[in-house]
C-alpha cells in the first residue's frame, strides 16, 4: 500500500488508480512513492508530519531509503482548507531540487484549489516521474542540515565511465 487516505479525500476508484500509478512509477524510477492525506495534528507542521510518516511506515528504496511522499494536510474533517508538503529522501533529493518542488507545488495547488485531491496527487506523481526521466540537474550542491556544510555534488566523469567499461570488459573476457 502506498496511498494512505486518512482524511477520506479519495473515492475507492481513485485510490485504486493512484496505487496502480505509483506501482508503475516505482518500477520505472527505482525509488519509493507515497501519497498521504491526513488531518492537521496539533503541534505538527506538514513537513514534520510527512517526514515522520515516511520514517514511521518504513518507506523508501535502497540503502538510502530513497523516495518521495506527497502529503495533503487538511485543517480538519469537513474543511476545504489545508496545506500540502512534498518530502524527498535519499537519491530523490537529487531529482527533486527546491526549484522542482516549487514547480510541483504550483501545479498541485491548481488542483487542490478546486478540491480535486486525486487529480493533484496524480499530477505530482506524473511530474516526479518526468523529473526522474530528465535526470539530476547539473551544478547541484549537497547541504547537510545538521552541520550546515555545503559540498558540490560530484557525478561520474567521462574517463571514470570509460575506465569502468574497460574493467568490466576485461573481467568478462577473462571469465
Placement of each model-derived feature along the sequence:
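Selective detector of the "anchor" transmembrane alpha-helix that sits immediately C-terminal
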Residues: 158-175
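Folded, non-transmembrane soluble domains that reside on the lumenal/extracytoplasmic side of membranes
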Residues: 1-162
Amino acid at each position: 500500500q502506498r496511498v494512505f487516505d486518512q482524511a477520506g479525500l479519495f473515492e475507492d476508484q481513485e485510490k485504486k488508480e493512484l496505487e496502480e500509478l505509483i506501482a508503475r512509477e516505482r518500477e520505472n524510477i527505482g525509488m519509493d512513492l507515497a501519497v498521504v492525506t491526513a488531518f492537521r495534528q496539533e503541534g505538527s507542521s506538514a513537513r514534520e508530519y510527512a517526514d515522520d510518516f515516511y520514517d514511521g511506515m518504513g518507506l523508501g528504496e535502497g540503502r538510502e531509503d530513497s523516495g518521495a511522499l506527497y502529503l495533503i494536510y487538511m485543517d480538519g474533517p469537513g474543511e476545504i482548507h489545508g496545506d500540502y508538503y512534498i518530502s524527498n529522501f535519499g537519491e530523490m533529493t537529487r531529482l527533486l531540487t527546491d526549484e522542482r518542488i516549487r514547480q510541483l507545488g504550483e501545479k498541485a495547488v491548481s488542483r487542490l484549489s478546486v478540491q480535486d485531491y486525486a487529480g493533484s496527487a496524480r499530477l505530482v506523481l506524473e511530474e516526479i516521474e518526468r523529473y526522474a526521466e530528465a535526470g539530476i540537474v547539473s551544478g547541484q550542491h549537497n547541504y547537510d542540515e545538521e552541520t550546515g556544510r555545503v559540498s558540490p555534488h560530484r557525478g561520474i566523469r567521462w574517463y571514470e565511465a570509460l575506465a569502468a567499461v574497460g574493467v568490466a570488459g576485461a573481467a568478462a573476457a577473462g571469465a
